[in-house]
């Protein structure tokens, strides 16, 4: 199972003072040293953390490595143009609202089938893998296949926020969705709200081949250092996978 480390919140810390540190690109290199298989970053329309320059610097820094860049972005034509210029390995389309603190749910692919078909085509033509960040829902999975996505990233936020019996219920939804998506020929990834405490159960789901995790790793990096925080998360994931 691959671990994509999201560097957004290194940039959040930098933007809190509008300064040059901490540098998210330096963070990406440390994460890779510690075992990250991919670097994920979300270029939001409001540029609240990651800036355009970060994406292009990261691309330059990783050009001679085999570490892929996963660009999370809203399905807007401004973002499409940036993706077609930067040419990351992967693009993950996510919903976006300016007032939200973080992404609040999955992309409603069902309601934008025609739009997404046209939107995705030129991105895929450049050899970029396209993933859709969706809720664990059969209808959304079917729509993802219809629009031509290569992969889905299952939104694990409901699972992460669940308590008591609801934890098992949400986990079951994710398991069923992962199995269904795999049967439909999609690659299956997952992410959002995953922590050192709750990641194991998701990592055990054999259909899921990649997890993208950011906030929990960066939060723990404050106390452990980034290298150790990434290493610890990777160990938990790999150990869960062995079970």
Swiss-Prot record:
Signal peptide: none annotated. Catalyzes the complicated ring closure reaction between the two acyclic compounds 1-deoxy-D-xylulose-5-phosphate (DXP) and 3-amino-2-oxopropyl phosphate (1-amino-acetone-3-phosphate or AAP) to form pyridoxine 5'-phosphate (PNP) and inorganic phosphate. It is found in: Cytoplasm. Its EC number is 2.6.99.2. 3-amino-2-oxopropyl phosphate binds at residues 6, 17, 193, 214-215. CDD domains: PNPsynthase (cd00003). Homooctamer; tetramer of dimers. It catalyses: 3-amino-2-oxopropyl phosphate + 1-deoxy-D-xylulose 5-phosphate = pyridoxine 5'-phosphate + phosphate + 2 H2O + H(+). Belongs to the PNP synthase family. This is Pyridoxine 5'-phosphate synthase. GO terms for molecular function: pyridoxine 5'-phosphate synthase activity. GO terms for biological process: pyridoxine biosynthetic process. The gene is pdxJ. The active site is at residues 42, 72, 192. Pathway: Cofactor biosynthesis; pyridoxine 5'-phosphate biosynthesis; pyridoxine 5'-phosphate from D-erythrose 4-phosphate: step 5/5. Keywords: Cytoplasm, Pyridoxine biosynthesis, Transferase. GO terms for cellular component: cytosol. 1-deoxy-D-xylulose 5-phosphate binds at residues 8-9, 44, 49, 102. The record marks 153 as: Transition state stabilizer. It holds the Pfam family PdxJ. HAMAP family: PdxJ.
């Amino acid at each position: 199972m691959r671990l994509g480390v999201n560097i957004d919140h290194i940039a959040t810390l930098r933007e809190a003072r509008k300064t040059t540190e901490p540098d998210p690109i330096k963070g990406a290199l440390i994460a890779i040293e510690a075992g990250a298989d991919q670097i994920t970053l979300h270029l939001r329309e409001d540029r609240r953390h990651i800036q355009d320059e970060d994406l292009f610097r990261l691309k330059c820094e990783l050009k001679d490595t085999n570490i892929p860049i996963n660009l999370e972005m809203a399905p807007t034509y401004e973002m499409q143009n940036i993706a077609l210029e930067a040419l990351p390995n992967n693009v993950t389309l996510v919903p976006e609202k300016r007032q939200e603190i973080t992404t609040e749910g999955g992309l409603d692919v069902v309601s934008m089938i025609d739009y997404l078909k046209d939107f995705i085509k030129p991105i895929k033509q450049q050899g970029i893998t396209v993933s859709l960040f969706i809720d664990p829902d059969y209808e959304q999975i079917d729509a993802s296949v219809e629009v031509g996505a290569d992969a889905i990233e299952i939104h694990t936020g409901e699972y992460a926020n669940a308590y008591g019996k609801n934890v098992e219920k949400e986990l079951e939804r994710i398991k069923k969705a992962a199995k269904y998506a795999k049967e439909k020929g999609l690659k299956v990834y997952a992410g959002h709200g995953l922590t050192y405490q709750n990641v194991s159960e998701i990592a055990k789901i054999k259909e899921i081949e990649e997890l993208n995790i950011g906030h929990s790793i960066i939060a723990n990096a404050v106390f452990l250092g980034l290298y150790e925080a990434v290493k610890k998360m990777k160990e938990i994931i790999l150990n869960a996978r062995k079970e």
